[in-house]
């Protein structure tokens, strides 16, 4: 940096403005809120923006503050804030929700991390197995949690697998986890960590710091809390929602009402409901999805 620029920067006067109202720490003075997930996993909320909120309000106020700057009005009554937040979410005005951010410390199996990282709208820094030795921790489900392949969802599993085959799977995991001993022995003999790691199973645990804004976090939660997602990542998504809800309760309520527990109808579906006629398509998957929606919309109607 040149001397001239240094001089110009030194001339800048920073005014530390005192707030007009009293503020409090939305995390209650704690440096982290932590929840255990599965056998060795966890999710910890380590920071949030805003960290301070006016007494009597939650971090939801930041959403309204950003929205109202458009027309020059400051923060108003809390009751008005709730209506505004619900309006913004309902009409997909997303940028005010991006003003709230959360930083998490997450520990999860590699196979979950690889699904998780598909959501590319976050900032991530992961444990590096090139620089460090991976810990001897593996995800090992109970026999009741071993699921058979779904007949309707190619990506998922549904009801529990019969005990004999489930036990065979758990025995298979035990054998795979024995690779860790070989991994350690080879590292001690001088094998590079970046190569040694490639023989380890995706059930081994990794960890990262993950920072994301509320708008993109809601998108992540809508997909990963859904019953069609893999149960293991759904457990993490549910935990994240439980951690953020006390901080932005109004926004979370809007998310549940207008996204997570809502239905999206296509033009063909609206026409079929309006006319009482079958769905105008031969696509079997579309028809099945429409039938599921009708069960939710008209639960007392006979098939």
From Swiss-Prot:
It catalyses: dUMP + (6R)-5,10-methylene-5,6,7,8-tetrahydrofolate + NADPH + H(+) = dTMP + (6S)-5,6,7,8-tetrahydrofolate + NADP(+). Coiled coil: none annotated. CDD domains: ThyX (cd20175). The active site is at 224 (involved in ionization of n3 of dump, leading to its activation). DUMP binds at residues 115-118, 126-130, 197, 224. PROSITE patterns: THYX (PS51331). FAD binds at residues 95, 118-120, 126, 213-215, 219. Pathway: Pyrimidine metabolism; dTTP biosynthesis. A motif (ThyX motif) lies at residues 118-128. Its cofactor is FAD. Residues 41-258 form the ThyX domain. Gene3D superfamilies: 3.30.1360.170. Its EC number is 2.1.1.148. One of its GO terms (biological process) is methylation. InterPro entries: Thymidylate_synthase_ThyX, Thymidylate_synthase_ThyX_sf. Belongs to the thymidylate synthase ThyX family. Catalyzes the reductive methylation of 2'-deoxyuridine-5'-monophosphate (dUMP) to 2'-deoxythymidine-5'-monophosphate (dTMP) while utilizing 5,10-methylenetetrahydrofolate (mTHF) as the methyl donor, and NADPH and FADH(2) as the reductant. Homotetramer. HAMAP family: ThyX (MF_01408). This is Flavin-dependent thymidylate synthase. It comes from Dictyostelium discoideum (Social amoeba).
